[in-house]
Amino acid sequence: IFLKTPRLRGLLALNMAVAAASAMVIVNTVVLVQADFGFSQRSTAIALAFFGVGSMVSALVLPRLLDKMSDRMPMLVGTALLVIGLGLGIFLKDYVTLVVLWALLGVGYSLSQTPSGRLLRRSSTAEDRPALFAAQFALSHSCWLVTYPLAGWVGATWGTQASFIALTVVAALSLVAAVLIWR
């Protein structure tokens, strides 16, 4: 079902973009805040909280948006925000910009990810729904299995700016694939 349904194949592409953005945040926040900017563990927690706040704001607004439009539009807009946020990260120079960027990535993350349950329910019957949710879980985690090591390896080898570049490319290609697949 998953690979035969265009909107679910599009979701798989969006999963890769979401994984790219979350990999940058989860893997490299400590490096950016403590090693690059010289701030404390507390500042690291605050930066991660900004990502969470962005995600929560988006999740709170999303039900009203979904009453007025299909799942596709906010999911694609959210993924575009992830691409933009990762791309802007290439030019990151200070902590204040980082927390604003993390909030933007949180908004994009939630817009991209939150409607996926509705999409899965709409694409399945009661009998195949558990298998479809299990497939989504496995496939989304396989995206993380690629992007988390990529974020760390590129960052450790060539620096966080290179990690931003690599993950921006992954997210952008994933967005293009989603748009082309999910019409």
What do these predicted ranges mean?
Residues 73-88, 165-169:
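Structural signature of the two symmetry-related core transmembrane helices
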Residues 90-102:
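Helix-loop junctions at membrane interfaces in 12-TM secondary transporters
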Residues 168-183:
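Multi-pass alpha-helical transporter architecture, strongest
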Residues 58-71, 155-156:
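Helix-to-loop junctions at the C-terminal end of transmembrane segments
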Residues 1-61, 160-161:
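A single, central transmembrane helix in multi-pass transporters
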Residues 10-11, 18-26, 51, 59, ...:
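Substrate-agnostic recognition of the 12-TM MFS/MFS-like secondary transporter fold
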Residues 35-37, 146-164:
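Transmembrane alpha-helix termini and helix-breaking/packing motifs in multi-pass membrane transporters
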